[in-house]
Amino acid sequence: MAVWQAASGKVYLPPSTPVARVQSTDEYVQRTNIYYHAYSDRLLTVGHPYFNIYDVQSAKIKVPKVSGNQHRVFRLKLPDPNRFALADMSVYNPDKERLVWACRGIEIGRGQPLGVGSVGHPLFNKVGDTENPNSYRQQANSTDDRQNVSFDPKQLQMFIIGCAPCMGEHWDRALPCVEDKPPPGSCPPIELKNTVIEDGDMADIGYGNLNFKALQENRSDVSLDIVNEICKYPDFLKMQNDVYGDSCFFYARREQCYARHFFVRGGKTGDDIPAAQVDEGSLKNVYYIPPMTNQPQNNIGNAMYFPTVSGSLVSSDAQLFNRPFWLQRAQGHNNGICWFNQLFVTVVDNTRNTNFSISVSSENTEVSKIDNYTSQKFQEYLRHVEEYEMSLILQLCKIPLTAEVLAQINAMNSNILEEWQLGFVPAPDNPIHDTYRYIESAATRCPDKNPPKEREDPYKNFNFWNVDLTERLSLDLDQYSLGRKFLFQAGLQQSTVNGTKTVSTRGSIKGIKRKRKN
């Protein structure tokens, strides 16, 4: 980046030239007036809201974890526009240009009614209520003060659109210095880590973006759904300052919470309140004055305070979903171009967080034949369902294969040029090759040990919800809800030119001017 720096004196010198400059996609991408509508099927998932259910015999997952507090990361696969048999071949020249998709609009559909879900822990580390105490709590002789506590999580609606996965951040355990190794039982150092947000990663529900699995060994400080998980939060600062802006074209976010209850943790305090034990009493009476020995306050309580959050009211007046969003200008240099013909949609929505309670008779008896109610004769189950639908407006764009543009794309990601098959084409060799029939038998030579490698998926180690839209595109925008909204919101109309449907501005019709009466 070109920044001014201070010299040895008090004069700031300009940056040295030349300085590499990243171009916006608008500088070399030529947009056409051809638009497509893409849509997915109804996307459904069902599971347990708190944890995976395993088969006892084989440790195989019988019921997956499906929570309203999870990230849903959809990887939308688009068809290659360079393989389209366009009716109007004058749209682009395949020898001098390549076609790409640009995202112009999106609508994330959400089914199911609004509802508030609850999370909790049957052995929650909560010693007492510190909001309205009327007597000082005596230190109990019990070594276990955990209680069965539940609460509703922080309310969160958010989606992030980009052609690369969304980057998340969380706090994790860090490696201590070798020369300053902490003693056992001391608080470990922590550091901020950046990782890709995958489908199923937990979002922040009010206890922060932390690796609870590594930093809460008592397994009772948070609810069951995150006690063995990593809660991630999108790193908006990193994505906004990305030089290319592929991870986030734009986003929408709505969060709200308030503190409902105020509790205190149990256990031995690791960080004592500074008092007379520090520096020969230099901090005596700084934070508190010691009570008399015959008072209950003489055995001072724990200072590990924390609230249980609440997402408060869930209303249809503040919904981010089931409405269209139009992309005119992205926040980064990539103005909606879908490199590699894919789009990543990261979604969190816990305003439809209802958990179904399903009860089944353990004796397999019909309901009409049950004489009286016995709670032990019924088994209770929890299930959570999610329902999504994706709709897109895609604009067909072309990129000229000039030296300046290819140099820019090669510096950004050379795999794009490989996908376009712009490599060196060798001269044809001898058309006759040897082909063995029984190549695997012991009578013939060994087969080639180094077959040509196909291009590996850079995201093969990540978990996404893959949605194939390669055969879900249509030029008939007026036949779909999002397509009609796109045409009407800008006063556009569709017409057919050389067999290809294009979009143009609707001409205005002037009204008849009335003659003024005398």
Curated annotation (Swiss-Prot):
Biased composition (Polar residues): 131-142
Major subcellular location class: virion
Record-linked InterPro entries: Capsid_L1_Papillomavir (IPR002210), Capsid_L1_sf_Papillomavir (IPR036973), dsDNA_vir_gr_I_capsid (IPR011222)
Region Disordered, annotated ranges: 128-148
A GO cellular-component term linked to this record: T=7 icosahedral viral capsid
A Pfam family it matches: Late_protein_L1
Biological process according to GO: endocytosis involved in viral entry into host cell; virion attachment to host cell
Gene Ontology molecular function: structural molecule activity
Keyword Disulfide bond: yes
Alphabetical keyword list: Capsid protein, Disulfide bond, Host nucleus, Host-virus interaction, Late protein, T=7 icosahedral capsid protein, Viral attachment to host cell, Viral penetration into host cytoplasm, Virion, Virus endocytosis by host, Virus entry into host cell
Residue ranges of the TM segments: none
Compartment(s) where it occurs, according to its Swiss-Prot or TrEMBL record: Virion; Host nucleus
Subunit structure: Self-assembles into homopentamers. The capsid has an icosahedral symmetry and consists of 72 capsomers, with each capsomer being a pentamer of L1. Interacts with the minor capsid protein L2; this interaction is necessary for viral genome encapsidation. Interacts with protein E2; this interaction enhances E2-dependent replication and transcription activation.
Job of this protein: Forms an icosahedral capsid with a T=7 symmetry and a 50 nm diameter. The capsid is composed of 72 pentamers linked to each other by disulfide bonds and associated with L2 proteins. Binds to heparan sulfate proteoglycans on cell surface of basal layer keratinocytes to provide initial virion attachment. This binding mediates a conformational change in the virus capsid that facilitates efficient infection. The virion enters the host cell via endocytosis. During virus trafficking, L1 protein dissociates from the viral DNA and the genomic DNA is released to the host nucleus.
Membership in a protein family: Belongs to the papillomaviridae L1 protein family.
Protein name stated in the entry: Major capsid protein L1
Organism whose genome encodes this protein: Human papillomavirus 14
Gene: L1
